């Protein structure tokens, strides 16, 4: 393929950040600023994306671009319209994210928050270069806004106190990013953009800092991504599905971001799917009508014959109802074999969905993109994964998780991102005691899983503790001898710890007495009695008056190995009075056996 057939496409830019940090406002402001520069050509609206042509970038940045000291050959910037993690993860290509650059929006007053941390993890995993927009500078106490001006210009006009305040906030942010493994600095102090994350203070409300933000993004793309942005102009199109939608009069359509090559009406396309790829033919390609032509809301699209990367396009074709977001889409070229393209696409999907761990958790997500992100997050925590798939949680998933739980209860779990659970699955999960964890925030899914593991470990420990003879101390109540022998039945008060049927008893001098057969309260049998309770117990073996008397103190006869386990492994699960009773029992026992409980 000759270089003459290649062209440089626009870098694809995704905006990420914590909820309420101003992603949408900033993105709207960038678009609004571009629309306002209509002398230079304004903005080109795509499906799911907005293109800011280079001329418009130049108009907004003014002389700032000259500071880059590099010839700008990219034709513009393509911003993904939907901010957030989900759009970012759905726009995926083999080996990484589709976005060439991300803008991570952080509220300068709040700093790094949980979803910021998640965004940083995703960006690191996908190795996506990013710029930090330290947003909401207009909220810095005392800041005087200057609409749509470059940040540095506005900064110079602030009082020394306000400048100091902003510097402190930027340095706090630098420190937080450093804790997450990223070296960062204010953009005008960055010497090496390959090693240092640039922080651009911005305001999505006033537009301050947007010229520098666009300058830094343009410079990054031009200087470091030029090779990556070279595309084969006439090559078969490659795209990622952003969304699957049903449109009136069109049926099921897919909104896709084309990142390489060309797609034409009539082309055969292959779309990846967890079951098997969808092979279909493009019925029509649609782009949004310009705002000034959109008179009828139901007639929002115009048909085009072909679309070249990078672009957002709506594709209408048969058999798209099964398509899923995050799936790869490939055009079958004239000299390509359909089967070969199907195989390549399937391999790409299987990289995400097929797991090799025999025992592991089951992950379900709403799209291939989010599935890949969730799988990545759990792999980072070294959690084995048995199956990862797209779609709601079904009975089949529960049966599979139950089979895993039989061998390892901590892995017999289903994790769902943004999915539903069928009624059948819910009922079966209750019956089989299979945990289902659902959330629409990835980091919370991982946290919930870790909490569940802790609870299960705790439950397992309590279960093991309950299999031991636990420490108990009782007093035989005077006047409550109901039967003297075969079995002896007496009233007792539990002074410390716990007693249960089956527990052996001993006297204060360590002599064995016999086993508790039954415990009754108000004439009804009970499973255990704890400190403070007064109950009747039957004891097989001893005779009241010969082996023990009313008023005597008795203890549970805890075997040495049980005491050892309680001292070493389960001490934290014992109540204070149980621990006290255990110490007293050990003291009695060690008169005969100095190594008791050791």
From Swiss-Prot:
Residues 203-205 are annotated as: G5. Function in general translation initiation by promoting the binding of the formylmethionine-tRNA to ribosomes. Seems to function along with eIF-2. Residues 135-138 are annotated as: G4. Transmembrane segments: none annotated. It comes from the Archaea. PROSITE patterns: G_TR_2. Residues 8-226 form the tr-type G domain. The keyword Phosphoprotein does not apply. The gene is infB. GO terms for molecular function: GTP binding; GTPase activity; translation initiation factor activity. Residues 17-24 are annotated as: G1. InterPro entries: EFTu-like_2, EFTU-type, P-loop_NTPase, Small_GTP-bd, T_Tr_GTP-bd_dom, TF_aIF-2_arc, TIF_IF2, TIF_IF2_dom3. One of its GO terms (cellular component) is cytoplasm. Keywords: GTP-binding, Initiation factor, Nucleotide-binding, Protein biosynthesis. This is Probable translation initiation factor IF-2. HAMAP family: IF_2_A (MF_00100_A). GTP binds at residues 17-24, 81-85, 135-138. It holds the Pfam family GTP_EFTU_D4.
